[in-house]
Structure formats: structure tokens, C-alpha cells
């Protein structure tokens, strides 16, 4: 996929809900798995348009594949990209607040 053809729904794959990310939501930080081809500007536009919020900043990191083994079969997990989105003061994503 080319970057120009990515829609907002293609950029944000799913929210990451762990104990750590749930605690970060109190600090207005939301964590998403995003498309590997996306960048900070695309993630910011996608979050702002899909959830009707204002984004203060976006931090992105590539998560490296981990070696896994099941019996005699060896492999690796897939590589993926994680985005930590910090919202401006007074904004929350209500759709994600109920998840636990």
C-alpha cells in the first residue's frame, strides 16, 4: 500500500489495552497498533478525525519480532508499529474508556 492510499481505518489497526496502557490513559495517553507504513502526521490526522479529539503529540516505535518456538518449529512474531498518542487537555476518547 502506498501512503496516499491509506485511509484512517487502515492506519489505526487496534488499541492496545494492557495494565500499563490503562494507567497511561489517566495521563491522556492512548496506545494503538498502527500500520507499518504510517507516520506521525498520518496517525495524528486519523485519531483526530475518527474520535473528534485534538492530539498534542504522537510517539511511534517499531516493535521488533521476538523468536518463538513451538516444539521443533522455530519462527518469529511479526514486526509491528506502536503509536502513543497524547491528547490535549480536556479531551478523552470515550469509545476506549469502557475497555478493560
Swiss-Prot record:
Q: Can you name a GO cellular component term?
A: ribonucleoprotein complex
Mention any Pfam family matching this sequence: Ribosomal_L23
Example of a GO MF term: rRNA binding
List, in alphabetical order, the GO biological process terms annotated in this UniProt record.
Answer: translation
Sorted alphabetically, the keyword list is: Ribonucleoprotein, Ribosomal protein, RNA-binding, rRNA-binding
Fetch the InterPro entries from UniProt.
Nucleotide-bd_a/b_plait_sf, Ribosomal_uL23-like, Ribosomal_uL23/eL15/eS24_sf, Ribosomal_uL23_CS
Q: What family, per the record?
A: Belongs to the universal ribosomal protein uL23 family.
Please describe what this protein does: One of the early assembly proteins it binds 23S rRNA. One of the proteins that surrounds the polypeptide exit tunnel on the outside of the ribosome. Forms the main docking site for trigger factor binding to the ribosome.
Q: How does it assemble?
A: Part of the 50S ribosomal subunit. Contacts protein L29, and trigger factor when it is bound to the ribosome.
Q: Which protein are we looking at?
A: Large ribosomal subunit protein uL23
